[in-house]
Amino acid sequence: MFRTSDAFSSFAVPDIEAARRFYGDTLGLDVRDSDESGLLEIHLGPGAPVLVYPKPDHQPAVFTILNLPVDDIEAAVTDLNDKGVEMERYDVGGSTADDRGIHRGNGGPAIAWFTDPAGNIISVLQDTGG
């Protein structure tokens, strides 16, 4: 019924150029113009890219829109902080964040959340090799 190999996700931002700078320059991701319609593609590896589309009346997502596994969460948070990105703190099933904003325990990998310029929630999480 569905061809999952062609499945993709997308999210909205009010300012496509701010998104291009944040995802490309700040996060160092492979960001490309999708076509002449003003969409961006974030290429994260094999498979379909994540589409980013402009929406003037954008409302930030209240959930994590993108999870980025990293080999060293401490280094990733340091790098983000050095680039002016601040970690968010959430109540996650009783776990609390350390002074750097990294949540540990609660049965999952170490994780830290931050927002893009549009207020969408993103995470970096310790890659557990799974």
What are these regions (language model features)?
Residues 21-22, 52, 89, 102:
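Intrinsically disordered, low-complexity N-terminal regions enriched in serine/proline/glycine
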Residues 30-71, 88-89, 107, 121-126:
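Conserved short beta-strand elements that form part of the metal-binding/catalytic scaffold
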Residues 5, 24, 48, 60-63, ...:
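Generic N-terminal initiation segments characterized by hydrophobic and/or small/turn-forming residues
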Residues 15, 72, 116:
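Acidic active-site catalytic centers that drive phospho-/nucleotidyl reactions
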Residues 1-18, 63-66, 125-130:
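N-terminal beta-strand motif that seeds the catalytic metal site of vicinal oxygen chelate
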Residues 1-2, 68, 77-130:
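Vicinal oxygen chelate
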Residues 4, 10-49, 56, 75, ...:
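Core segments of cupin and vicinal oxygen chelate
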